[in-house]
């Protein structure tokens, strides 16, 4: 019931279209129900009269039928066009809501869910939901009207023959209800398996260069074959269930024709029914069978739609772990004093501490470098400052304000991040630089590119700033992508900077250019740097050596070398 209420809520903005759609569906059904009755009346009364009476009545009857079918055609046009558009609008609304919610979800959600499943919910599930949103109520409404209307006329024609038919219908619906739960579980499994196929496909295509460089095409083919075959198995269970459902329902429909012919013939033999009425019965059975077939097919659509909607709701009802507190305030006039006070952290699904009682302070405009072995928690420290994750205990402040008391948007607007793994969006160089400030002028973009030492390279390209970078920036070298990402941060112009191993994967020439850019970028900004190379480390105002138990050593490069501890050993290694 909760799911149904949530689903009905999405019809709200389109109530007028929805109800007009149902009115048109009613008219379509009534016209179909009216024709056998008109034919019966003509057969039993008009066609028993003289030829002149018949001929004089045909023109008015034809005109009436013409008007009736014109109205039905217009209603069908509305249902087919506006009804489908209503479903499309609802699909758009849900897709936008789902995308917006994905944008709000915390890093922890993405740590635990794969993008292929998320894409499946955004595309495949919502298509099935939209189809059901339109066809579900409409087909159900039409079918119910035709079934009830047909039975009313069947009872009026001969109630004795209608009773066994009604019994068969109850048997059919009882069987259908018993199959519903089984069908729903197979459709849910089917949705999960197509999500797995999407995940495998996306993973392989995103890493196609690695696949081909290792000549591992056969390995990936086998992985995909397994995912694809598992999807086939889920479809097999799905269609087996549907096959038994359709087969039994078709059997019940055949029984209706059998009962109509045999029991109807018996009633004619007993003089309790006219042969012409049996012909009308056959017409109404035809009208009656059609909506039953539609309802049978609708069952599959309902199961697909509701399975998809449940997966949609599961995401929409997932609350982001990181949210603004009720009284959160915007962060303004930032000087850049950053303090970590007894900070401990573990991931939500693991009680093992990644950081334990870490404390340090960075004066405004100063820099620290985090050094230490991989896995010691350096990147975690950098992820806690913009609240990608929340501390498990302790607190982090900026200018004395606990970051949990600040709005996420204002907090992250004051922090610029340059990462080792640069992500460029599929678009132009200009669009990627402007990501740091979406409303930036062309002059501002060019100025940021100059500061990042990438302007001359961009100008050397045939299309300049309008050069298409390819998916994830595949048309550019690592150094070029890194400088574009630095230009992005120059444009953002934040008072606090995080440099996460920004030069560790580059050649010496690229590193030299980028190091110059980073030095300009870091000037007068509070900067946290994660680095392995000596040239990057030694220029910091303070170096923190992070080990398994937190901060093992701290001091300037010279002080730590003189101490001859972990840091000195780390540099010699």
Features from the language model and the residues they span:
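A short amphipathic helical element positioned immediately N-terminal to and/or at the very start
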Residues: 1-15, 118
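An intracellular "coupling" helix at the cytosolic face of ABC transporter transmembrane type-1 domains
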Residues: 16, 107-108, 124-133, 137, ...
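Juxtamembrane helix-loop junctions of ABC transporter transmembrane domains
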Residues: 23-24, 31-44, 68-115, 119-123, ...
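Helix-loop-helix
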Residues: 48-50, 54, 153-167, 241-310, ...
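ABC-type nucleotide-binding domain
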Residues: 331-573
């Amino acid at each position: 019931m909760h799911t149904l209420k949530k689903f009905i809520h999405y019809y709200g903005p389109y109530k007028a279209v929805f109800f007009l759609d149902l009115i048109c569906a009613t008219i379509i059904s009534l016209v179909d129900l009216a024709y056998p009755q008109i034919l019966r009346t003509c057969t039993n009364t008009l066609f028993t009269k003289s030829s002149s009476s018949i001929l004089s009545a045909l023109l008015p009857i034809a005109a009436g039928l013409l008007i009736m079918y014109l109205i039905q055609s217009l209603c069908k046009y509305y249902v087919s066009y506006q009804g489908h558009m209503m479903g499309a609008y609802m699909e758009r609304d849900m897709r936008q809501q789902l995308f917006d919610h994905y944008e709000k979800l915390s890093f922890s959600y993405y740590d635990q869910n794969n993008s292929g499943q998320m894409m499946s919910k955004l595309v495949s599930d919502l298509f099935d939901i939209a189809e059901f949103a339109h066809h579900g109520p409409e087909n159900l409404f039409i079918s119910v009207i035709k079934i009830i209307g047909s039975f009313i006329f069947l009872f009026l024609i001969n109630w004795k023959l209608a009773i066994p038919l009604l019994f068969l219908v109850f048997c059919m619906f009882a069987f259908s209800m018993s199959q519903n739960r089984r069908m729903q579980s197979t459709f849910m499994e089917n949705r999960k398996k197509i999500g797995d196929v999407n995940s495998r496909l996306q993973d392989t295509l995103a890493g196609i260069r690695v696949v081909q460089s290792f000549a591992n095409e056969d390995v990936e083919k086998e992985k995909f074959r397994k995912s694809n075959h598992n999807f086939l198995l889920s479809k097999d269970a799905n269609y087996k269930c549907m096959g038994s459902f359709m087969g039994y329902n078709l059997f019940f429909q055949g029984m209706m024709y059998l009962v109509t012919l045999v029991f109807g013939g018996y009633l004619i033999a007993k003089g309790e029914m006219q042969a012409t009425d049996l012909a009308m019965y056959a017409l109404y059975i035809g009208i009656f069978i059609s909506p039953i077939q539609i309802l049978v097919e609708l069952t599959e659509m309902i199961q697909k739609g509701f399975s998809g909607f449940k997966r949609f709701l599961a995401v929409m009802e997932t609350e982001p772990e990181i949210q603004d507190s009720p009284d959160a305030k915007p962060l303004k006039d930032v000087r850049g004093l950053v303090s970590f006070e007894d900070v401990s952290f573990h991931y939500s699904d693991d009680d093992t501490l990644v950081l334990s009682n870490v404390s340090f302070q960075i004066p405004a405009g100063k820099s620290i470098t985090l050094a230490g072995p991989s896995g010691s928690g350096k990147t975690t420290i950098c992820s806690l400052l913009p609240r990608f994750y929340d501390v498990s205990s302790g607190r982090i402040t900026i200018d004395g304000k606990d970051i949990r008391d600040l709005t996420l948007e204002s907090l992250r607007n004051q922090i610029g991040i340059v990462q080792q793994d640069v992500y460029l969006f599929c678009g132009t160089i200009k669009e990627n630089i402007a990501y740091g400030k979406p409303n930036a002028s062309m002059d501002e973009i060019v100025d940021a590119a100059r500061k990042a030492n990438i302007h001359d390279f961009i100008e050397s390209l045939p299309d300049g700033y309008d050069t298409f970078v390819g998916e994830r920036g595949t048309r550019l070298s690592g150094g070029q992508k890194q400088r574009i990402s630095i230009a992005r941060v120059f444009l953002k112009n934040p008072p606090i900077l995080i440099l996460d191993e920004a030069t560790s994967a580059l050649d010496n020439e690229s590193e030299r250019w980028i190091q110059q850019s980073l030095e300009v970028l870091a000037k007068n900004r509070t900067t946290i740097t994660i680095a392995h190379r000596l040239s990057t480390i030694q220029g910091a105002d303070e170096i923190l050596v992070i080990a398994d138990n937190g901060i093992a050593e701290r001091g300037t490069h010279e002080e730590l070398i003189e101490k001859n501890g972990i840091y000195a050993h780390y540099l010699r290694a």
